[in-house]
Amino acid sequence: EILSQADNPRAFDALIKAIEATNSGLLRYQYARYLLGKQQLAEAKEQFDALVADPAATVDHLIGAAVLDIELSDSASALLHLDRALSLGQRVSDAQFFKALALIQLGDPSGAIDILGEVGPSTNYARALQEAAAILISEGDIGAATAFFEKHRKTHPNGAELNFAVHAETLQTLGSIAAESVLSSGISAFPTSTRLLFSRANFRERAGFFELAEADYREVLNLNPGDANALNALGYALTNNTNRFAEAAGLLEEAISKDPRNPAIIDSLGWVYFKLGKDRQAEVLLKEAYKQYPDPEVAAHLIELLWTQGREVEARDLIANQWRASPNNEHLRETASRLAIPLPE
């Protein structure tokens, strides 16, 4: 009730008095988290310091205090709290992850890698894998990063599906074609993983192997018939890679019937309607998508519609606004180049 009145400066008077009167760890912890959310870090630290001063501090209190210390670059203090948390045997993977972050902050990447190797499936599992890969890649050792992922899959088999996904994402950021092999291995191990199938479909589509990508998109639909996101992915891919626009429109119309407020689906349907020559319907949809989600890719679709209708001033204004917000964006650059639209200086 008090938190619901947070905009009232006097709303917390009763809470603070209750904390002072009872020294309730639960109330103090809730107040500390509220202060964190408001970015009142110094005030939040006062509350966390009081919490961890109690010998009976809970794991949540200790990890919360450590996370704040890391935010404040007080890594040594964070490590003390995290070691206490680890001794309690609860939320072990979370404590290990944040301990690794503290070690990174202290300039001990080797120690961080050792700890990250112990983090099991948990809230921060994907971030742990990403941090480890970033350390190893920054040292110029892609092979060591791959070995880390492979070892982790063996020691933490319950996290293997997510491991394959993060491993492939890491390789893709490096422009490595080995990402497809990792995804294929993952799909062999987890043939019903829509996450891995989506990732491989996206990779194959970008690499120019659309027939293979389409097969993956369709397998996702086989696993999740009628799923709006899967329908959108396949419909949008067909629009961009084939002239099967009527088929794509059918998929996207089904998608929007299931999720009518999704701006990605609205954009996709507007885009395929444009390809079908339904300019009036396309414009309504593309403008609505852009209103909800002013993304450069959505903007590029609307820019192309406007430009091909001879509405060059509107198109130039839109591309200028987007170019300022997202300079050198690939979608804007490709559209401008293909249509010979001058880009802003």
Predicted features and spans:
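Alpha-solenoid helical repeat scaffolds
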Residues: 1-345
